[in-house]
Amino acid sequence: MAKKVQAYVKLQVAAGMANPSPPVGPALGQQGVNIMEFCKAFNAKTDSVEKGLPIPVVITVYSDRSFTFVTKTPPAAVLLKKAAGIKSGSGKPNKDKVGKVTSAQVREIAETKAADMTGSNVEAMTRSIEGTARSMGLVVED
């Protein structure tokens, strides 16, 4: 018989840097999950990813206090900031432009995020990432 799901916990945790401090500890502690077990498993799974990159994770907690988790790709905004070499987006994206990204970089980000995005093809996903870039105050060059 399948285990009964108690809760879903969604977090963004820095790759390879999960530890029992907030936000991980309190979120999982409320569900009665072994926090260190999650931290070790998460850090092992995100070993191949650049350390410190925020990774969205969905943790499924079962009624017997066991858990499974699924990691996703980093948010598009984080990947765009990294590609443009900036710390943060523009406060006024329509007036102040803070950086530039090329179409090739945007396409590469779209291909990276393809597994997590809803879209029929890479072109549609590329347009979506371009929209995110524009809303951050980045200029997309051909």
Swiss-Prot record:
GO terms for molecular function: large ribosomal subunit rRNA binding; structural constituent of ribosome. It comes from Serratia proteamaculans (strain 568). Forms part of the ribosomal stalk which helps the ribosome interact with GTP-bound translation factors. It comes from the Bacteria. Part of the ribosomal stalk of the 50S ribosomal subunit. Interacts with L10 and the large rRNA to form the base of the stalk. L10 forms an elongated spine to which L12 dimers bind in a sequential fashion forming a multimeric L10(L12)X complex. One or more lysine residues are methylated. One of its GO terms (cellular component) is cytosolic large ribosomal subunit. GO terms for biological process: translation. Keywords: Methylation, Ribonucleoprotein, Ribosomal protein, RNA-binding, rRNA-binding. This is Large ribosomal subunit protein uL11. Pfam families: Ribosomal_L11, Ribosomal_L11_N. The keyword Ribosomal protein applies. Belongs to the universal ribosomal protein uL11 family.
